[in-house]
């Protein structure tokens, strides 16, 4: 009996130890789970606040379809301000990440280059061509974080009844001036390629049609193929009291495959907002995809925004429809080489850099030795494609 009692006692003791051990395991598991839950919650909370509540994007012109993906972030129900010539509002919920709540979109500043706008801290991001980022790379430390359109709609147009142009070199033979904004890289390229002379360059363009109308389209003029072509052929009475056909070359047609209006930041600002950009850039690019899939709500809103701004710039449904059609026809809104609608193609950037370096060396303009230093594709990793 004693033997049996001893065994029973040992059994009870063993059971008690096992029970205690099991209790310790359960408590440890509970503690671990609680810690993991807390850590996850803290991580989520941190991710929810990695972005500023408000951001400002500086565009390179008045509201137009070529900016559609940026306006898509706010949607058609934002607020247009005539005094500041801006558009602002809450970021649509499907694009709001990292604690970002509001966005302001500023239009062109005629008295200030966008690189200076960034340098002076007047915007967080700005539209600047990749060529211009390269040109300013020694003077202003900027970095491109994403594209807008894939191909540049920038063009040079002319009256085909006054100038018989069969190839870009024919522009030079006419001796006619080329009206353009100052400081444009593609004009430097055209001069360097022998498509025009420096004497033909007239950098006094202000974006209006007044000079073209006054002189009956006797010269060459810059513009967007997705915009001005329609206006001069349908809206602007510039020849014999009515609109007339124009011909054009895009800068890509002439071999200058620039990236237009890339989303650019000061390098230190991008570093500061690194965690934010990891979340935000894919959403910004999703907004571009969404806009291109259904542009009308935004392009219709842009008509009204320009009316509120009450300047010389105006849009119409016909213009917007024609512009979107041309974007698709000329594949100006295609995916990047990696399948995203976001990244900069390294080979294309290197080719552009080579074209510009020769020009800038001749002009005495110092630029970076490494084109990859002016752009990053790191934030495009989670970006969608079309």
PLM regions and their residue ranges:
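Bacterial N-terminal signal peptides that target proteins for export
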Residues: 1-9
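C-terminal motif of bacterial Sec signal peptides marking the signal peptidase cleavage site
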Residues: 17-21
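Bacterial signal peptide processing site
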Residues: 23-25
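Extracellular mucin-like PTS domains
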Residues: 29-47
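Short, glycine-/small- and polar/acidic-enriched structural segments
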Residues: 47-205, 219-222
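Pocket-lining segment of extracytoplasmic ligand-binding domains
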Residues: 131-132, 206-211, 215-310
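Secondary-structure end/capping motifs
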Residues: 272-362
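Conserved C-terminal helix/tail region of periplasmic/extracytoplasmic solute-binding proteins
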Residues: 346-386
